[in-house]
Every structure is written in C-alpha cells, then in structure tokens.
Curated annotation (Swiss-Prot):
Gene Ontology MF, one: structural constituent of ribosome
UniProt family annotation: Belongs to the bacterial ribosomal protein bL32 family.
Organism, scientific name: Bifidobacterium animalis subsp. lactis (strain AD011)
Signal sequence annotation: none
Name this protein carries in UniProt: Large ribosomal subunit protein bL32
Domain of life assignment: Bacteria
One GO BP: translation
Length: 64
C-alpha cells in the first residue's frame, strides 16, 4: 500500500477535497407540459421525451 512521503498541508488537503463532492441534479422544463424534469429522462408528468410519448404519466392515487 502506498504511503505519503511528506505531510500534506491543511490548505492542500482542503483544496484537493473541494473537488470531490456531489453535484446537484440537472433539471430542465418539459417543452410539452412545462413541468420540471431530469435531463435525458422521460417527463414524469406527461410521459414524453424528445417530442414522443414513451409511457403513461404517473398519476397519484387520489386522482381519477
């Protein structure tokens, strides 16, 4: 197992760790219905993706 030869300073450690973080999910507005949705994923409101309907929209249990 590799071991560091020199002690890493606090500034260098924090600089290195600052790039290792989670990114926020990229959301876009659906051009069909205007609801926010994840990029490259079918819209959960209307079920369309790139102008085509791929699946039925997810409906809540109390809506009929």
């Amino acid at each position: 197992m590799a071991l560091p030869k020199y002690k890493m300073s606090r500034a260098n450690t924090r600089t290195r760790r600052s790039t290792w973080k989670a990114k926020a999910a990229q959301t876009i507005t659906c051009p069909n219905c205007g609801a926010p949705t994840l990029a490259h994923v079918a819209c959960p409101s209307c079920g369309s993706y790139r102008g085509r309907v791929y699946r039925e929209a997810i409906r809540s249990a109390h809506t009929k």
